[in-house]
């Protein structure tokens, strides 16, 4: 067992205990406010400011890719342990728009970034030697000057990114220190390594033997954080849904990606349709949090499972599907509506698709003129989440067992695609026959035939999505991004892994405060890139789209211009 000192919402530090068991995917304890649904400055995961450790690396980090203005101060010790001296955010208020409004977000960044940076200056660790050139004087106190400035360069909203990037450049120039302009999704993927570094006890860190070398006047930190490469990362947020094989710091192979909208966007849309308006807009959320947010996905989870709030041992009553045939069966409710899993007709295609389920929910409510009782709405919320979470989890299984196929496959042996549009969930007025049920029954029959001919299928088509040589086995799956804070998602993924023979595969889930956008993860990505010898030129610009995969069109993290070796 180890303890990381966490501060959630605006409360004092609270201890969060983690288990070394690979079967657990969440903290055994954390504050009942699972989400930072706030439009005010929030503290999260901070330690008390102390004197800087000799030989450590210190960075000030900025994140402004969307609607959260985030600043952090992070220190990495020679042992590999980390101290988070400051980590705060301001979330812009978009309630009037029902979603993120670009201009409102930029104005919020412009108004709040400088005050947050000023607060961060006061949280810098004290400098023991106030006569050297690494000292900053803040309110008459000698503080340690950061070794470099970390900032998100992309992907994200260009104007928002530019606000943070230009501020970071100014500090780097003023302090005469390097700039590290990092990839936002890389930062999410590396977050569990930050969590493991924060969780190291001081005694354990002091006792651990480390190998140190010299690069200029700073020390190279040799301790390898956990999880070690390779591992699978499921990155799920309002703007991204991707399954990634993280092979190395800058090598993240995309195994599956969303064909249309991201899962976070889909959950927000479904929440606006399913959750009663008075719960969605007019009053406090079910966490008793008095603030209201346009991040409706967390509200959907709380609405679906109100008794789960604050109960870490909540029984969801979930039984994972035993076979692929079970996975693609439509859910037929006693109320007369049906939900069909995404891409059921595509076999084991490595892709994600969420617009269809969104259309099905819309059609169900439209056909009832939105006159749906509360209990039925809760059922719809639960089953919608279950279906899309199983859709995510099955792609993890395909990657682990090597049976996933390239994403651009056509439906096999005929069989019309059940995309979940209104026409597919409505009854055929001429025959009274449910089109979705009939189509899915046909697909199940096809898959049974396909299973019987498995050897012939594997001989005709590649069995994996990757043509690389045999790689080390995957021992860890990481859930990261804002949607990864959904505890029902964690439960579904863990349950499916256990049921399909992967109980020995660890599921790493950062605390909710580190799943959503934050500057601590940006600082950690900067620390890892800095230790690997990378720096950013001062002429770099914000990038709206920036891939992770070095085999992608843009060459991945290192494929764009602006990188220099330190």
Question: Positions of the model-derived regions?
Answer:
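Short beta-strand scaffold segments in enzyme catalytic cores
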Residues: 68-75, 190, 233-235, 241-245
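A contiguous, well-structured pocket-lining segment that forms one wall/lid of small-molecule binding clefts
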Residues: 302-434, 444-477, 486-498, 558, ...
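N-terminal mitochondrial targeting presequence
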Residues: 1-56
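Glycine-rich phosphate-binding/hydrolytic loop that grips phosphoryl groups
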Residues: 188-191, 510-552
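N-terminal beta-alpha supersecondary unit
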Residues: 55-145, 151-155
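Conserved phosphate-binding/catalytic loops in two-lobed NTP-binding clefts
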Residues: 181-182, 475-477, 493-522, 536-540
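Conserved phosphate-binding catalytic cores of ATP/NTP-utilizing and phosphoryl-transfer enzymes
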Residues: 182-231
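Glycine-rich phosphate-binding loop plus the immediately following alpha-helix
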Residues: 246-319, 354-368
């Amino acid at each position: 067992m180890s303890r990381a000192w966490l501060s959630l919402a605006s409360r004092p530090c609270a201890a969060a205990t983690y288990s070394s068991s690979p079967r657990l995917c969440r903290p055994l304890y954390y504050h009942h406010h699972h989400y930072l649904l706030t439009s005010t400055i929030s503290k999260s995961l901070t330690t008390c400011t102390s004197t800087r450790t000799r030989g450590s690396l210190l960075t000030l980090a900025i994140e402004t890719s969307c609607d959260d203005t985030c600043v952090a101060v992070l220190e990495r010790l020679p042992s590999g342990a980390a101290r988070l001296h400051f980590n705060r955010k301001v979330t812009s208020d978009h309630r009037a728009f029902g979603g993120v409004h670009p201009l409102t977000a930029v104005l919020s960044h412009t108004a709040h970034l400088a005050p947050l940076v000023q607060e961060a200056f006061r949280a810098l660790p004290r400098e023991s030697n106030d006569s050297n050139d690494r000292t900053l004087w803040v309110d008459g106190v000698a503080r340690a000057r950061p070794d470099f400035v970390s900032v998100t360069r992309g992907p994200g909203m260009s104007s928002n990114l530019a606000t943070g990037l230009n501020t970071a450049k100014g500090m780097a120039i003023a302090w005469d220190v390097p700039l590290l302009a990092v990839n936002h999704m890389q930062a999410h993927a590396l977050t569990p390594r930050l969590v493991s570094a924060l969780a190291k006890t001081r005694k354990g860190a002091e006792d651990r033997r480390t190998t140190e070398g010299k690069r200029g006047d700073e020390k190279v930190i040799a301790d390898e954080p956990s999880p070690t490469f390779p591992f699978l990362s499921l990155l799920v947020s309002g703007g991204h849904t991707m399954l990634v094989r993280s092979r190395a710091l800058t090598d993240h192979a995309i195994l599956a990606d969303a064909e249309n909208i991201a899962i976070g966007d889909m959950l927000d849309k479904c929440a606006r349709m399913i959750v009663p308006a008075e719960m969605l807009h007019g009053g406090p959320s079910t966490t008793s949090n008095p603030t209201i947010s346009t991040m409706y996905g967390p509200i959907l989870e709380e609405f679906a499972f109100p008794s789960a709030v604050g109960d870490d041992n909540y029984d969801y009553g979930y039984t994972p599907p035993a076979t692929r045939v079970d996975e693609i069966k439509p859910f037929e409710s006693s109320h007369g509506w049906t939900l069909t899993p995404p891409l059921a007709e595509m076999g084991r295609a490595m892709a994600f698709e969420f617009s269809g389920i969104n259309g099905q929910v819309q059609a169900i409510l439209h056909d009832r003129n939105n006159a749906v009782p509360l209990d039925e709405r809760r059922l719809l919320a639960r089953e919608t989440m279950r279906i899309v979470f199983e859709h995510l989890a099955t792609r993890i299984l395909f990657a682990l067992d090597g049976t996933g196929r390239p994403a651009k496959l056509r439906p096999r042996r005929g069989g019309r695609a059940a995309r979940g549009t209104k026409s597919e969930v409505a009854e055929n007025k001429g025959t009274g026959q449910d089109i979705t049920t009939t189509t899915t029954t046909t697909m199940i029959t096809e898959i049974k035939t396909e299973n019987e001919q498995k050897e012939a299928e594997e001989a005709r088509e590649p069995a994996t999505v990757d043509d690389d040589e045999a790689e080390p086995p995957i021992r860890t799956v990481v859930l990261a991004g804002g949607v990864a804070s959904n505890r029902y998602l964690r439960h579904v993924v863990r349950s499916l892994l256990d049921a399909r023979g992967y109980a020995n595969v660890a599921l790493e889930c950062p605390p909710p405060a580190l799943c959503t956008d934050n500057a601590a993860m940006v600082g950690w990505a900067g620390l890892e890139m800095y230790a690997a010898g990378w720096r950013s030129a001062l002429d770099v610009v914000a990038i709206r789209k920036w891939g992770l995969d070095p085999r992608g069109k843009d060459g991945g993290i290192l494929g764009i211009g602006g990188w220099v070796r330190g």
